[in-house]
């Protein structure tokens, strides 16, 4: 905080506040201690104003001790609470509004009056201080010396009226203390000062990615000028931020824009102490250049070359390349200063420097752990933006979330409010019906409820103190999870159990295939526990095996268990990428081709849902060039689309399915469904499939995959379990039409027998159920049989399927009840 601008008396107030906090054994300096500090300076304007309202030091001490009392023995250094920081900030704002150069006790009092939360505000309320009158009294006590300051300031900048109307004076804003501190950019600021001190072409341009802090460097220069931390050549200079949009705005006729810009240049030249800062420098090119008129860049070129105009520009790398570099004459007048993205460690230091501002604004405490977490998590999971901007945004939003959460009215208060409203309506109705005795009772009840509400509200406000609210790592994790969809909060007990039992969850949908389910579950657990390689996807797998054994179903089951729905899976059918030219559809069409603006089918989906299961189905059907694209996804966890955007695959599970080798197996006719030699047969199947896989795909592709899993053929027992699962699904569908079905074990055995085919896995079962159950049921429904509300029992007597329709027990009971 900028304590350097405080008067001696105001500094003594802060010292008294610290003494009072120590006396009361409090661990922090809050608004109440600032108020006590003001009362300890009886000669100050603040104490005199409060005295006119009969507020004395004794009364304030009594109220403070009554509200918060004495604490335990305090340990360690004292720190200002977020609300106290906010009061100091508000007092500086009051001084600025009154055009005072220093902050006195009167400004601190105005800050306390404006801060309508905290202990000091409650003291004022308890002592019946009229806030509006107190403020007016302070302004009256000050008299109006600010007018002379205002006039002096107007005269000071009177020689640049046009510039003042179009630009912001960063040095004045820096003097007021409203600019955020600039941390860790000494090297860049020094380079800017060196370029500005040249004789000609003294125009630095700050080039860097969006959000790395280019504008902050210009603000840092303004602060350095205010603090006299610059060479003699720059002392007394004004840094003026010019917005080209403001210059162009309102210039209706030809020549108006040029005249306005020329006037600004003349004022800068005559003043001799102005450094122009143009954010978004590329807007110079073409600005005001309609219908053949000269644009802003060409008007400025002569002055920039001769050194008559000192200009700092700021623009992104892309805009500099597109707009500035193509105009060689403009480019040579600017000296590029590269602004690199800060490291995570530098970002943490920047966040620590900004902490006071955000604590004061949100009135919460921000822990060191939250700052470290914001820098690290934003760097790791928000890949399309740059530090420190994304980390600062994360802290800001998380603080806002915590602040709002702590100020939400509790349910018990809302309930009492509703009761009061209900009683009020009943009372009005009773009065309207001339039931005065009932109305009197309701009035008493309303009074009692209102008193209860006041007590509950007071208790809530006493316990809900923003100074005790703090921002934690967990809050940061919640916000970034909301941004990206990636779960980053601490693993709670429920989720821990779910992850540990993931195999059981997957086996509810996928029968058999223990190896595949275990391998996938381990990869998900590693990722959620934070142990996976941060530069690679969560897991990448190739599922091999004959058709119909559950390869695609396992991917669907994983998507449902991770996200709660099958739709969370991104499915890419590789049969659509059989031609060489179709490969570009994954990352987007090249420039000049139809669909370039639409983005890639794969990259766009992953950009929108970075935490997902990606299924590449039937990969052997795709053109070999597809696998060249997947190499860097599997190894580095990212892919660049046709627009140059980097798409992050580090939080995806990549599953590729293939039937390669299935034909070879069919030809060799291995034994498949159980038996004594099932283990030996599986090993033979595995060897055959791996051999075929190595023939079909390149070694550098296979070497990047985490695990290659060969699925087992399905046994008869497993097929029977699948029949049960399919029947359950059919039962659920029919229950929507109020039809119950039950299938006997004999019927299930027959369905499994009819759907048994070693070569095609479980898919023939679907056809068997359609043929034996669904077709006959649909005929029963359409044939006029009223089977709604009835039970259909499906059995097999050894020759054919039997359908026994009976009244449901529950519907029979309902019928009896309605008749009685």
Curated annotation (Swiss-Prot):
- Transmembrane region(s): none
Q: Name the source's superkingdom.
A: Bacteria
UVR domain residues are 417-452
Region (II) spans which residues? Answer: 471-662
Annotated binding of ATP, by residue: 208-215, 545-552
**Domain Clp R residues, every copy:** 3-144
Concerning SUPFAM superfamilies, the annotation shows: Double Clp-N motif, P-loop containing nucleoside triphosphate hydrolases
Q: Which UniProt keywords apply?
A: ATP-binding, Chaperone, Nucleotide-binding, Repeat, Stress response
Task: Note the InterPro entries from the entry.
Answer: AAA+_ATPase (IPR003593), ATPase_AAA_core (IPR003959), Clp_ATPase_C (IPR019489), Clp_N_dom_sf (IPR036628), Clp_R_dom (IPR004176), ClpA/B (IPR001270), ClpA/B_CS1 (IPR018368), ClpA/B_CS2 (IPR028299)
Q: Name one GO biological process term.
A: cellular response to heat
Q: Which residues form the signal peptide?
A: none
State any GO CC term: cytoplasm
- One annotated GO molecular function: ATP hydrolysis activity
Question: Residue ranges of region I?
Answer: 163-410
Pfam families named among the record's database cross-references = AAA, AAA_2, AAA_lid_9, Clp_N, ClpB_D2-small
- Annotated segments matching region Repeat 2: 80-144
What is the stated purpose of this protein?
Required for growth at high temperatures, probably by acting as a chaperone during heat shock and targeting heat-denatured proteins for degradation by ClpP.
Give the family from UniProt: Belongs to the ClpA/ClpB family. ClpC subfamily.
Name used for this protein in its record: ATP-dependent Clp protease ATP-binding subunit ClpC
Tell me what organism the protein belongs to: Staphylococcus saprophyticus subsp. saprophyticus (strain ATCC 15305 / DSM 20229 / NCIMB 8711 / NCTC 7292 / S-41)
Q: What is the lineage of its organism?
A: Bacteria, Bacillati, Bacillota, Bacilli, Bacillales
């Amino acid at each position: 905080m900028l304590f350097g601008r405080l008067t001696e008396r105001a500094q003594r107030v802060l010292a008294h506040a610290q003494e009072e906090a120590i006396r009361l054994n409090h661990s922090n300096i809050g608004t109440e201690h600032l108020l006590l500090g003001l009362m300890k300076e009886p000669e100050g304007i603040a104490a005199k104003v409060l005295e006119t309202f009969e507020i004395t030091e004794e009364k304030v001490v009594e109220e403070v001790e009554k509200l918060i009392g004495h604490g335990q023995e305090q340990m360690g250094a004292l720190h200002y609470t977020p609300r106290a920081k906010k009061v100091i900030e508000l007092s500086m704002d009051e001084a600025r509004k009154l055009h005072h150069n220093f902050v006195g006790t009167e400004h601190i009092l105005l800050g306390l009056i404006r801060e309508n939360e905290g202990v000091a505000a409650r003291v004022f309320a308890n002592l019946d201080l009229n806030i509006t009158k107190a403020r007016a009294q302070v302004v009256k006590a000050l008299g109006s010396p600010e007018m002379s300051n205002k006039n002096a300031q107007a005269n000071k900048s009177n020689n640049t009226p046009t510039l003042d109307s179009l630009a912001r004076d960063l040095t004045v804003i820096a003097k007021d203390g409203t600019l955020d501190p600039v941390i860790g950019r000494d090297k860049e600021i020094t380079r800017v000062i060196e370029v500005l001190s040249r004789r000609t072409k003294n125009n630095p341009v700050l080039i860097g990615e969006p959000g790395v802090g280019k504008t902050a460097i210009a603000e840092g220069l303004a602060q350095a000028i205010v603090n006299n931390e610059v060479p003699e050549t720059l002392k007394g200079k004004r840094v003026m931020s010019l917005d080209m949009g403001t210059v162009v705005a309102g210039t209706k006729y030809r020549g108006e824009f040029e005249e306005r810009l020329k006037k600004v240049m003349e004022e800068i030249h005559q003043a001799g102490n102005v450094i122009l800062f143009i954010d978004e420098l590329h807007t110079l090119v073409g600005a005001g250049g309609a219908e053949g008129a000269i644009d802003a860049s060409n008007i400025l070129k002569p002055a920039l070359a001769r050194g008559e105009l000192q200009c700092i520009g700021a623009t992104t790398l892309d805009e500099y390349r597109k707009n500035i570099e193509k105009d060689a004459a403009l480019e040579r007048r600017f000296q590029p200063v590269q602004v690199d993205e800060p490291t995570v460690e530098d970002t943490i230091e920047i966040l620590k420097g900004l902490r006071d501002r955000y604590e004061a604004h949100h009135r919460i405490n921000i822990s060191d752990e939250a700052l470290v977490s914001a820098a690290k998590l934003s760097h790791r999971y928000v890949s399309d933006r740059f530090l420190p901007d994304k980390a600062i945004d994360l802290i800001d939003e998380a603080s806002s979330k915590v602040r709002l959460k702590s100020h939400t009215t509790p349910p018990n208060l809302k309930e009492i409010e509703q009761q009061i409203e209900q009683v009020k309506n009943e009372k009005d109705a009773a009065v309207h019906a001339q039931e005065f005795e009932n109305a009197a009772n309701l009035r008493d009840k309303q009074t009692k409820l209102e008193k209860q509400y006041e007590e509950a509200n007071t208790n809530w406000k006493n316990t809900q103190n923003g100074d005790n609210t703090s921002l934690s790592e967990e809050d940061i994790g919640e916000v970034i999870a909301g941004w990206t969809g990636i779960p980053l909060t601490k693993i709670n007990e429920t989720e821990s159990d779910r992850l540990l039992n993931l195999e059981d969850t997957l086996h509810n949908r996928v029968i058999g295939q223990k190896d595949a389910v275990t391998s996938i579950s381990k990869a998900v657990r590693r990722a959620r526990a934070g142990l996976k390689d941060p530069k690679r996807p969560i897991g990448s797998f190739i599922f091999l095996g004959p058709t119909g054994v559950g390869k695609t179903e396992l991917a669907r089951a994983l998507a449902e268990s991770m996200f709660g729905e099958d739709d969370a899976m991104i499915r890419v059918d590789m049969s659509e990428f059989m031609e060489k030219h179709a490969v570009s559809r994954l990352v987007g069409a090249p420039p000049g081709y139809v669909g370039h603006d639409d983005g890639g089918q794969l990259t766009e989906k992953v950009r929108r849902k970075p935490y997902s299961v990606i299924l590449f189905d039937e990969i052997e059907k795709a053109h070999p060039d597809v696998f060249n694209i997947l190499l860097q996804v599997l190894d580095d966890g990212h892919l660049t689309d046709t627009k140059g955007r980097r798409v992050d695959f580090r939080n995806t599970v990549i599953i590729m399915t293939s039937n390669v080798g299935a034909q070879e197996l069919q030809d060799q006719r291995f034994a498949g469904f159980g038996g004594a030699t099932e283990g030996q047969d599986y090993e033979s199947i595995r060897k055959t499939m791996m051999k075929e896989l190595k023939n079909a795909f390149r070694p550098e592709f296979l070497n990047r995959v985490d695990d290659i899993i060969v699925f087992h053929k399905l046994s008869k027992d497993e097929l029977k379990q699948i029949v049960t699962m399919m029947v359950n699904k059919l039962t659920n569908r029919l229950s929507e039409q109020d039809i119950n079905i039950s299938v006997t074990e004999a019927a299930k055995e027959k369905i499994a027998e009819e759907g048994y085919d070693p070569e095609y896995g479980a898919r023939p079962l679907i056809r068997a159920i359609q043929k034996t159950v669904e077709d006959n049921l649909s005929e029963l429904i359409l044939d006029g049989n009223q089977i709604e509300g009835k039970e259909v029992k499906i059995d097999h007597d050894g020759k054919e399927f039997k359908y026994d329709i009976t009244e449901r027990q529950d519907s029979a009971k309902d019928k009896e009840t309605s008749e009685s």
